[in-house]
UniProtKB/Swiss-Prot annotation:
GO MF, one example: structural constituent of ribosome
Gene designation per UniProt: rplJ
Family note: Belongs to the universal ribosomal protein uL10 family.
UniProt name for this protein: Large ribosomal subunit protein uL10
Source species, domain of life: Bacteria
Native source organism of the sequence: Roseiflexus castenholzii (strain DSM 13941 / HLO8)
Quaternary structure annotation from Swiss-Prot or TrEMBL: Part of the ribosomal stalk of the 50S ribosomal subunit. The N-terminus interacts with L11 and the large rRNA to form the base of the stalk. The C-terminus forms an elongated spine to which L12 dimers bind in a sequential fashion forming a multimeric L10(L12)X complex.
Length: 187
């Protein structure tokens, strides 16, 4: 008979699996509590979560949510990291943590219901984050607007230059005529 705690754990894992865009399965052996806390903090900053779960309970949750593809990765001590929003930022947070003295061993993951090999996550880490994509899109949108402003301003500048040149020409012509009409002082 399953205990209430196990039922709640399965329900929690199901909810996370249903919400996630990417899940990473890792071996956390060798990490201290402080290391795990540091990793959780880094992942939380990227909008992700890191949980340690029993393989049996994870299998049950995976089967009930249609994520059976994760089952081959559930061997030995298992930790799961769930990304809900900005996947490249999430993978970069894991890679950044793994550059330190303590590392987690990434076994693979899920993208939706598709099994990912460990090396695919390295490719995902090279993708731009949401903020970077937004900046690129805004930059792309701003460039034509800036060009349009230049095109619109050009005729106005040309008119101003023409009027300036015309007024100077008229001024010089008037000055020349005034000089002609004035009696010369040598006469």
């Amino acid at each position: 008979m399953p205990t209430q705690r196990k039922i709640e754990t399965v329900a929690d894992l199901k909810q996370r699996l249903e919400r996630m865009q990417v899940a990473v399965v890792a071996d956390y052996r060798g990490l201290s509590v402080a290391d795990m806390t540091d990793l959780r903090k880094k992942l939380r900053e990227s909008g992700a979560e890191f949980v340690v779960a029993k393989n049996t309970l994870t299998r049950i949750a995976a089967r009930e949510t249609g994520h059976e593809a994760i089952e081959p990765l559930l061997e030995g001590p298992t930790a799961l990291a769930f990304a809900y929003d900005d996947v490249p930022k999430f993978v970069r947070a894991i890679n950044e943590f793994n550059r330190g003295p303590k590392k987690i061993t990434v076994r693979g993951g899920l993208l939706g219901t598709t099994l990912l090999k460990e090396n695919v996550l390295d490719v995902v880490a090279t993708l731009p984050t949401k903020d970077e994509v937004r900046a690129q899109v805004l930059g792309g949108l701003a460039a034509p607007v800036t060009g349009l402003a230049g095109i619109i301003a050009a005729p106005v500048n040309d008119i101003v230059n023409l009027l300036d040149a015309t007024s100077k020409s008229i001024l010089y012509a008037l000055q020349a005529r005034v000089d002609q009409l004035q009696p010369s002082s040598t006469s």
